[in-house]
């Protein structure tokens, strides 16, 4: 839910009647959603919608999902004033995810609150099965933030904290990352290589095992994987796999990097991301995660964006309660930049999604 910076009331549009709808998803509507999401991200400095939400909308458009998301809009004479997306639970034991945003020029007048109430009511009794993501708080306090106040006002309470950690890159840091990677070796029975199309199913199996208890990553499907590998940002040379010497399908660990396209130049931009690090449960405890993480960091330290600009920072996301990973990343020089929080309906004991 977008939460930062309330516009000056004098800049708000004249009072108008917003029309709520749950429209049929079309290519044109998805393009309008993308433009809306980009406008919100430019204003707030953080995206209100996750990559998975965009992927689920794309899958629904192609009718390649059995659980299409619910998509609600508030429109003002053809302009998207607010959007509410509910990713549908995959089964009776699963929970869904809500992400929503209000256009900057429509904030501060209760439009978002009224629309949010309307959309939640449309979910009916299933509303208690959903979790609300709030992205990009500047610190881990959150208690005074407008987003926290909004969530609690609507009967939600925080249940999960996700850190975005950032490592600025300079000449010394780049050199140190390469040296650290070069100093690591794999066991004699393993080799380092990069992803190919033949790795799809072996990777999905290992990913599911490595993230069996992870709310999002462990649920990735073949369609989800292909959405990502078919994206403009995908670079197979940045997807590292440690597999058995004699059997490529026997994957012991992997690290996937991401360099988003279309980034603006800034102090910490363009940046690359440690997208995901996974270790086969049967291979855990041998330091493979650290070895592959360092290989990915060394790659990003020397990488460029699509325009040939060297990366100026590396970022990643880690759950606050994953103290092992957090300690690893802080030891490598990462610091917490922003905090995402997941909220659940108050008094609900179901697991977070």
Describe each region flagged by the PLM:
Residues 1-14, 91-92, 104-188, 343-345:
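Acyl-donor-binding surface of acyltransferase catalytic domains
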Residues 2-60, 179-218:
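Short amphipathic alpha-helix that is part of the acyltransferase structural core
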Residues 2-4, 148-176, 294-298, 307-353:
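Active-site/acyl-donor-binding loops of N-acyltransferases
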Residues 22-24, 30, 34-140, 251-271:
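Conserved donor-binding loop and adjoining core beta-sheet/short helix segment
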Residues 102, 277-279, 318:
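Hydrophobic adenine-recognition pocket in adenosine-nucleotide-binding enzymes
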Residues 108-122, 276-279, 285-302, 326-331:
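Conserved acetyl-CoA-binding loop-helix of GNAT-fold acetyltransferases
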Residues 203, 250-255, 263-271, 283-287, ...:
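Extended hydrophobic-aromatic, low-complexity segments
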Residues 208-260:
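Phosphate-binding active sites in nucleotide-utilizing proteins
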